[in-house]
């Protein structure tokens, strides 16, 4: 009898511990405010997965190949707003992991891969408190083992690209980036990382700066793209 009583007591204590742990781990989903154990609730995770591209490497060609995890619509579009304007940084870590997992499954291994996130200007960084591209890139590197490099800086403040024509976008970011105290050397394979790709004006401007230093930019990886072709 004592052994049975002791076993029952241990089992009850373990159940209480697990319940307390689950309560501690639970949080509110940043997208819908439902209770969630993971970063987002299961419902919102499914909504995000529905935006995933069947072939993330469908645009991996040309002068600056593009690798895009998803389509910039629906829950991805809404979650990006929550990330950048409501400060839900955990969303960046979620997308960094999704992008990294997809990259590892879809792309051949690239030797000496160095990841450079598209930087924010110092004024925007101070206002927002973080650079979403850098958070995504940090998680990407953590999963893939790629090296993170932060020597690229945005030296000139630019207006938001949204609503600008293609030519105006190119003019807006021209001369806005520079390498500062960089230790990058020729022979490295550089992958640019950003949250969203629309016309590509920003990443092309960055690639031009890096290539002017005889650095090889193999492409750009983003969470989502608005391309329809």
Write out the residue ranges for each language-model feature.
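Glycine-rich phosphate/pyrophosphate-handling loop used in enzymes and phosphotransfer proteins
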Residues: 1-229
């Amino acid at each position: 009898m004592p052994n049975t009583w002791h076993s029952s007591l241990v089992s009850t204590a373990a159940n209480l511990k697990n319940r307390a742990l689950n309560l501690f781990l639970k949080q509110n989903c940043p997208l819908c405010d439902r209770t969630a154990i993971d970063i987002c609730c299961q419902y919102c995770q499914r909504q995000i997965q529905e935006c995933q591209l069947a072939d993330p490497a469908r645009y991996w060609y040309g002068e600056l190949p593009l690798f895009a995890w998803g389509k910039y619509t629906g829950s991805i579009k809404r979650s990006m707003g929550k990330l950048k304007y409501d400060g839900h940084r955990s969303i960046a870590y979620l997308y960094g992991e999704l992008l990294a997992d997809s990259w590892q499954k879809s792309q051949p291994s690239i030797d000496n891969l160095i990841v450079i996130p598209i930087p924010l200007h110092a004024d925007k960084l101070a206002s927002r408190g973080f650079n979403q591209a850098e958070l995504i890139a940090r998680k990407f590197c953590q999963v893939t083992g790629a090296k993170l490099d932060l020597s690229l800086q945005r030296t000139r403040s630019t207006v938001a690209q949204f609503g600008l024509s293609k030519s105006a976008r190119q003019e807006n970011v021209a001369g806005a980036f520079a390498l500062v105290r960089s230790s990058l050397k020729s022979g490295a394979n550089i992958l640019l990382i950003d949250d969203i790709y629309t016309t590509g004006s920003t990443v092309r401007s960055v690639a031009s700066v890096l290539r002017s230093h005889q650095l090889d930019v193999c492409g750009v990886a983003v969470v989502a793209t608005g391309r329809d072709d």
